[in-house]
């Protein structure tokens, strides 16, 4: 997802909302696959989800996730998801799935007219 000069302001806000503002979900999804280091989290987000979050933003998000008990830092500097983190990831996934179904319903009814 990229923003260029032809991207409307509304679309730019949407892209930011589903990438940077929900970065914590991407971090938890990566860590759900196994413990890893922050620089690897950034690399995997770029590879898997096709956006490149600012490094300082990623570290801030990971710091907050750790403070909330959703991830924990190991002695070697890697991070892993906690049970609370897994529950939060599931709830976020369910919430986004419900939103997607609602949007599908809207589109179906819009084009049905």
Regions found by a protein language model. Give the residues of each.
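Short, Lys/Arg-enriched N-terminal segment that forms or immediately precedes the first helix
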Residues: 2-16
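Amphipathic alpha-helical dimerization/coiled-coil segments
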Residues: 90-113
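Short acidic/histidine-centered micro-motifs embedded in hydrophobic/aromatic stretches
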Residues: 44, 61, 106
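Basic amphipathic alpha-helical segments that dock to polyanions
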Residues: 58-60, 64-65
